[in-house]
Amino acid sequence: MKISYLVIVLIFSSSVSAQSTNQPSDYIVSEIISVYDGDTFRANINELPDIVGKNVAIRILGIDTPEIKGKCKKEKTLAIKARDFARKALFNAEVVIVKNLKRDKYFRLLADVYFDNTKLASALLENGLAVSYSGKKKSSWCKND
């Protein structure tokens, strides 16, 4: 009797603890505040506590776009194109969803970002406005400049 009671308690407690650690992996962005460059923007995510989800910097996972304050004219020009592309996509979207949230070394949220079911990273890559990035050394946008 004691053993079966113990087994029931263990099964119940493990299922409760598994449920309490399950966090949603997809969040709807309630407001786009600003788009700094092609891979970084600020947003509100009402599903998260204010300390985490209010005016939070989000960096798009898996890509790097040129820097607005780049090292050469080519990089700065491409940076403006990437930023404008991201602005148009995010501000004109019916829905923006962030998935697979992580933190980077600057405490920004890293996420896969979708606008109207289109992955923003893929769209930027397809338009030549981003390169794949895994957190190592960044590519130079100023080659042959």
PLM feature spans:
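Small beta-barrel nucleic-acid-binding modules, primarily SNase/OB-fold domains
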Residues: 2-5, 15-145
